[in-house]
Each structure stands twice: as structure tokens, then as C-alpha cells.
Amino acid sequence: MAIKFLEVIKPFCAVLPEIQKPERRIQFKEKVLWTAITLFIFLVCCQIPLFGIMSSDSADPFYWMRVIMASNRGTLMELGISPIVTSGLIMQLLAGAKIIEVGDTPKDRALFNGAQKLFGMIITIGQAVVYVMTGMYGDPSEMGAGICLLIIIQLFVAGLIVLLLDELLQKGYGLGSGISLFIATNICETIVWKAFSPTTVNTGRGTEFEGAIIALFHLLATRTDKVRALREAFYRQNLPNLMNLIATIFVFAVVIYFQGFRVDLPIKSARYRGQYNTYPIKLFYTSNIPIILQSALVSNLYVISQMLSTRFSGNFLVNLLGTWSDTSTGGPARAYPVGGLCYYLSPPESFGTVLEDPIHAIIYIIFMLGSCAFFSKTWIEVSGSSAKDVAKQLKEQQMVMRGHRETSMVHELNRYIPTAAAFGGLCIGGLSVMADFLGAIGSGTGILLAVTIIYQYFEIFVKEQSEVGSVGALLF
């Protein structure tokens, strides 16, 4: 049944726009150029407002997810990478449940990727319709059918651009993937802005700067009591403070430290005697994939809950899923969950709220650890990184594990890879929870994604440098 399903959608995949694989080896300088162009297009789309919207001043229902989903409210990048990640989540769950079986052949892999792209486009249309019909840009009846359709078309075209930009990098024209690049850019932009933002905010304590570092100098310059000013700069509420910034730097350091944890399996050439090497299995075997998929799951749950709350507020089942409240304290207006399932799956705002509602914290910890471990373990089966896939790759390279025959390699790799995937996912979830509880800027999930993505780019740079021989030859 599984292969039949992929065969059914094969004709639809054939008509989808596709980036062709490069016919020659792309030089590092060209990859940097294409990556920069991709990032430039994305940033431009983040600044172009949607034409036809009546209002976007209401409380932002997806404020908490925007940093992670690389989206920007009221612009062409309203949906961000959400459709791509959601389609990946759905396809992974279907493959993990054996509803869809992905074969080992390149044809099956290509068909699976095509199906993922098709679902991504369908989800883009679905999310665009939901955003418009729930009144995010104004009352649909007042805007009229023509304007509503125009907004949906704009969001669909922007979603298609994101899909193609991601595919451009994935096919080897650029560095890394579009999803990773957009997420890291958005998160780093948020951290820098909240540290150095010159925007002023009127609070009960008077006019203050949003940026934590600028606020420090402003408070020390304007307050007569310097000790109190220093305390306020470190611990002020509802705006970024220095403790948030220190927590962010601390989490960066911890994640980089954990990146070095790995097990090196000794391998040797089956053709040439005396040629030895190692195959590294990292603690973060699936990298940031678990946290991206977990974010997609929560993001879509938020969308459904918000949509139902708007239409059926007061319904018992809707309230069980999530109840929402608006706030504009210390920043832009935003909606946040105050009850129901969405509340318990959202991170506590600070360590103080953990002590106030420990049940919320415990449920959140269990959900984060469990979901990240689950997604990490199932991802290896559909991404070509399971023990069977690794053994096949080593065999193709005519390499075998020292002390093991070819037939026993899969069994030996199975001792390490599934464990590394599950435990690595567990650690990713744990680090994200720690960052949330410490109050790191950009959310624990965001910080974790930023660090792992930046580290991936560092590894790409080191790999390219080792192939060329020097940094000068690499860039010039």
C-alpha cells in the first residue's frame, strides 16, 4: 500500500517546479554567492508588506512561534518555513507509522521528497486560507472576496519561493539548507535586536529602552541610585534584561560543548590492507531535526486552537484544547495561552513562573523530552541515516568495521545509532527546557536551533578548507 500511495501522487509531483541538480562541482565561492543571494531574497520578502490587508494591529496569535518559524507578521513571509516543516512532519509520521514505506532506491527517495514538496504547497494554501478567514488581516466580509483571494495568492507565491530557495541550497548550489539558514538568521537578528534595540517603551517605571545593553547605560546615566539602576538592568520584568543575555551566552557555550561528544567506530578498507579510519557517531546524531519537528507540531496546534477559539469561544472542547489572552506589556501586542493543552505545552516564561505552577513545568518537560526523543529516533529511518543505511554506505566505499564481518556490521551499528538518536534527541529537549527556564532571549528552542545551525556551517567551512588546503585558496 505504501509504494502504491507514492505511485498515485507521482503524476502530480512531475508537474511541480523543480531545481535541477548541478551538472558540475560547484566551487565554494559560488556556493557562498548563491547562499547570500538566497538569504537576500528571503530578507527582502520579510520586509515587503502584504497588499490588501486592512489591519495587522491586533494581538499576534503566533508571536511565540515566529522566531523559530522564520516568519514576519503582515509581510510576504507571514507563513515563513511553517509549510515546509509541517509537510516534513506529516511525511515523517506517515513513514514512521509504516503507512508509507520509503525504499532504499534513489527513485523512492526522490518520490518521497516530491510528495513532501506537494504537501508543502497544499499546506501553504490551507494556512493562507485559515489566516485570511479567521480575520488576521481584517474582517473578510468587509475586505471582499477579491482582496481575500489576492492575499491568499500572495502568501502562496511567497511559500513557493521559500520551497524553491530551500531546494536550491539542498541540491548543492549553496551551503546547508534554506530552512536552517532562515531560522538562524531570524534568531540571530532577534538576539542582536533585543540586546541593542534603541526602541523606547513606556512602562510603569518610565520610558525605557528595549535593548538590554542600551538599557544598562541609560539606567546608569539617568538614575541617581546606581545600585538600584544596576539591579533593574539585570532583573527588569517584561523587557529583555542582562540576565536573559547572560543566560543566552551560557546556553550557546553549553550546546557547543555538547557538540563535541561522539563515539568513533574504527573502520578499515576491505581492498587496501593497512588503511584505517574512524566513523564518528555524534551525540546530536540527528542534529536539530527533532526540535524543528517539535516546533512544527506545537505551531500547528497553536494555529488550530487559535482558529477554533476565534469561532467557537466558550465551547468546552475548544477550551480544553486552549484558551488565549492578549497582552501588550513591554512590547508588541501578542496572544498567549492561559489554559488548556496549549498552555501546558508552552514554555514557562521564567523560573519564577515554574515555582508558581510546577505542574505546568513538569508536563512541559515530559512533552519536550518525549517528543524530541521520538522525532529523533523516527527521523533516522526516513532520512537514510539508520544503521542499515550506514552499513550500506560503508560497503559501497569498501570499508568494514574492524573486528566485524560485513554481515555483522548492521548489528554492531544498531548498538550505537538508535541509542545516539534517542539520547541525543532527549539532550536536545533537555537543553531547550533549560534555556527556557533560564529566560534565554529568543526561547530555548530558538537558541538551540541557532547554535546547532551555526555549528553546521562551521563544519562545512572546515570540510571545504581541508579539501582545498587553505583559507586563502577557499575564498580567493
Curated annotation (Swiss-Prot):
Any GO BP annotation: pronephros development
Compartment(s) of residence: Endoplasmic reticulum membrane
Cytoplasmic-facing ranges: 2-33, 97-117, 166-172, 262-288, 376-420, 463-476
PROSITE patterns: SECY_1, SECY_2
GO cellular component terms, semicolon-separated: Sec61 translocon complex
Residue ranges that the UniProt entry lists as topological domain Lumenal: 54-76, 139-144, 194-240, 310-354, 442-445
Domain of life: Eukaryota
Residue ranges of the TM segments: 34-53, 77-96, 118-138, 145-165, 173-193, 241-261, 289-309, 355-375, 421-441, 446-462
Membrane topology category: Multi-pass membrane protein
Listed Pfam families: Plug_translocon (PF10559), SecY (PF00344)
Gene3D superfamilies: SecY subunit domain (1.10.3370.10)
An annotated Gene Ontology molecular function: signal sequence binding
Transmembrane helix in keyword set: yes
This protein's UniProt keywords: Endoplasmic reticulum, Membrane, Protein transport, Translocation, Transmembrane, Transmembrane helix, Transport
InterPro entries tied to this protein: SecY/SEC61-alpha, SecY_CS, SecY_dom_sf, Translocon_Sec61/SecY_plug_dom
Subunit details: The SEC61 channel-forming translocon complex consists of channel-forming core components SEC61A1, SEC61B and SEC61G and different auxiliary components such as SEC62 and SEC63.
Function in brief: Component of SEC61 channel-forming translocon complex that mediates transport of signal peptide-containing precursor polypeptides across the endoplasmic reticulum (ER). Forms a ribosome receptor and a gated pore in the ER membrane, both functions required for cotranslational translocation of nascent polypeptides.
UniProt family annotation: Belongs to the SecY/SEC61-alpha family.
Name of the protein in its database record: Protein transport protein Sec61 subunit alpha-like 2
Organism: Danio rerio
